[in-house]
Amino acid sequence: MKKHIKTIMVVIAGAAILIGGIWGINESRYPNVPAFDDHFTRKFLNKDKKVDDGFYEFKSKTGQYTIWFPEEYQLLHENEQQYVKNDNFYERWKASSVNKHKRGDQLNYLQVNLSESNPDDESIYVESLFKGEFGANDPEKWETANTRIYFDAAYLYFKGTEEHVIHDKNKHAPNTYIGYVADKHSNKVIELWFDDSLNHQTNKGLEKREWFVEILNSIRFNQENSST
């Protein structure tokens, strides 16, 4: 009986080692960065396509677009409201990076919304977005071969319940970045928000601006599904 129990224990131990080895091999196939440490996030990423320093290609589950995803970020998915998808025309996700800070752990958030919008009303949507967030509609605008991009950034803070906005980058580095990207060949649009809560230094503002603009420029809509 003891010999039988010992045999069973040896078999169990061997199986555990084998399973652990297989798991280790599977995990080693992924890049050693936070984005791939999360099993949900990695489902969207191409591990073989590091598109630039610090970014991997993210492919939407709608099949409508790809975007550069920062390797130090992970998608939030603790509840059904943090990642939302409706057929192939709407998707909303939020990703965060946790950094150590002398004030404690704080989060930087990146949120991306895919939806559809009438191109004829683009100026109305753009004004509503930027005026609603910053109290002014004066975004930068540029174009790529296939997209129109609007961008602005400012420092937002509250005094009591009243929100204040500082647009002057020399007075304070922005902590809120917003982008609006419209596909030239369809009615697809993407709105992006970046909440840079950890940014307390004016000289870091330019770095974050360049980082966010890289993400805006990286968006590629799926032209096979385009329809106006």
Where are the language model's segments positioned?
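N-terminal targeting sequences that direct proteins away from the cytosol to non-cytosolic compartments
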Residues: K2-W93, F194-T228
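Second-shell loop/turn segments in exported
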Residues: K59, Q111-S117, E163-D168, L198-L206
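Solvent-exposed, acidic/flexible segments
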Residues: P119-S123, K171-P174, Q201-F212
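Signature of long, low-cysteine stretches enriched in small and polar/charged residues
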Residues: I124-H185
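Short, exposed beta-strand/loop patches in secreted or surface proteins that constitute
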Residues: K47-K49, E57-F58, Q74, Q82-V84, ...
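Ser/Thr- (and often Asn-) enriched beta-sheet segments in non-cytosolic proteins
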Residues: E57-K59, T66-W68, Q74, Q111-S115, ...
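A short acidic-to-branched-hydrophobic micro-motif
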Residues: E91-E127
